[in-house]
Amino acid sequence: MNWINVNAGDMIYVTAGTVHTIGGGMILVETQQSSDITYRLYDYGRGRELHIKDGIAAIKLDSKAGKVVRESDGDPNMLVRSPFFQVEKMKLREPLQASVSRESPHIVVAIEGAGIIESAGMEPISFAKGEAVVVPVSVPAYTVRPQWELEVMRMSLPTGDVAEPRTMLG
């Protein structure tokens, strides 16, 4: 069992099959590979169904879970790239023009501030801290317009072949 001390802004990568929990008082954005399965091994007395047998069978002991080691030569906005998703974090003071590939929608989450997502042929969508907007592949281009300073995370599928990120226990 490993305990990872976290601070605001830390990026933790948890590989599938890693038993993990989120400590009290934490607020997080959880991005995961596409899956319809969650095995609950403990539920803090909430009374939801547990999945002990299936959960134990799915555990991987060779987990690469830990704090993501940021690559110094890469994109400064990129928090993590994995074979299943990528996560970027940006502080916006000016509008951001973005395009969506045919392979991946974008999920834009406001971490601080508020903004509007605009695209030709659709109504503008306002969003603020803690809210997310899914930009589907049918929208080829969009603009994120901050109403004041806006900090966002943007999730999408990675492009090209991507290895597991480097991590460290902290």
Per-region residue spans from a language model:
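Extended hydrophobic-aromatic, low-complexity segments
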Residues: 88, 98-101, 117-119, 125-126, ...
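Ligand-binding loop in jelly-roll beta-barrel domains
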Residues: 17-37, 124, 128, 137-161
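Glycine- and acidic-residue-biased ligand/ion/polar-headgroup-sensing regions
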Residues: 92-121, 129-130
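Short peripheral tails and domain-boundary helices/loops at the edges of structured domains
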Residues: 35-53, 151-170
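C-terminal amphipathic alpha-helical segment
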Residues: 37-105
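A generic structural signal for well-ordered coil/turn residues at beta-strand boundaries
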Residues: 8, 16, 25, 81-86, ...
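Short acidic-glycine-tyrosine-enriched beta hairpin
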Residues: 2-13, 27, 119-139
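Contiguous mid-protein beta-loop-alpha structural module that forms a pocket-lining wall or clamp
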Residues: 1-47
